Amino acid sequence: YVGEDGQLVRSAWVEYDGNYYFVNSSGAKITNDWRLTTPYDDDSADEEWYYFKSNGKRAENEKITYKSKSYYFDSDGKMLTGCVTYDSNAVDEANDFVDGKTFYCDETGARLEKNWVYSVEPGVEDDDADADEYWYYFKSSGKAQIGKGTNIKGQTYLFDNEGRMQTGWVALTTSTSSNAKEYLEIGGEDSTAKLSDYTDVYFCGDEDDGHAKKNKWYKTWRPEDFDDEDEDNDEFWYWIDKNGKVYIPTEAASGSNATGYKYKLEDAALAQKKVSGSYESFEITKKKVNSKDYFFNNDGEMLSQFIEVVTPNTADGLVTGMYYFGGDDDGSMMTGSQSVRDDNGDTYKFYFGTKNSTSENKGVGITGNKSNKLYYKGLLLTADDYKYQIATVDDVHFFIVNKNGSIQHSCVEYKEDSDVLIDASDLAKTAFSTTEGLYKYSI
């Protein structure tokens, strides 16, 4: 190329028939090569990277593949970095997110593929100190992942419809205006969101560990408390299946669920416990996890300690009665003999049914005679103040028990030292029931 002065142009831009070229120090146009230089019409501007194709023309408004990597150039030929919007007609720095058309190029200009980026949203300046940053994942096609990414380095991640990775409690939501489905974080400060409001719920940890948890128990805060810095808020156990879905009883099931109350062992007796500040009953669903039975409320929170079922659900195999699910970090239905400490640290014996039969139900605390011991809602009744005492069951059945809880059924004087505590010597032998069952030896 020869300039207007008739001299050979060297190491400079050349414009010819509306196309732009660059010549090297020998005056030959460069092809299939890069140049870091100032723009064609502004020598005072910052240098940018440009690519010149096999015909020498500057790459403009297009994607170029160079050494198996993709690069994007705007209408002025400038190589773009960061978020880029591209379709077959135009290339530009991204001002917002466009599904299937938003890509990310690193500082070398190469499009990221099968890789993560922690960045501000498209259209936001990188140096904006007030701007939030998010994790984005770009697939092998270079397109940003939205929705559920099921095999990202062996893990599942959830993204909203603008490609932002979601953390904490995440639910599949439906827009009221467009009916579009989208994975969004739920809960947080001032939130009234409850897990029972949603069908598909996942738990994805924090932004440093954002994959959906799977096939495990996970203990964490409710959605409304998850982002709260108050560590005094209660945490609950949730079951997450192999697909990452948090177990939440379905709306259809909850309409026929059993109902019950929480209890605690307090001062040697079972006392009703408040739930969410009240003594109102709540719905209960039984679910088997890893061959063990658990109770859940409608928000998928595993229940523990003592639960009395007052409205049964035969479909779940739940009958009325007192059940025990161990401590706060256990939760599996207990059967057989159990030792439980009360709030004072004293230990008491319980017995819960081991099978369903005419005399007991699996998991239900025995009320009455079991192996010649007297129980009430599973709690072994014993003589406390004296060697023998009369214990009443359901205000109808009366038993004589000793300090071990053994039922006495002889027509004798029951003494402690020389004092007669209970005089049954005048009773007929038939006064003690001999009918086999829970009330055998009752008076």
Regions from the PLM with identified roles:
Residues 1-443:
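Extracellular adhesion/carbohydrate-binding repeat motifs centered on closely spaced tryptophans
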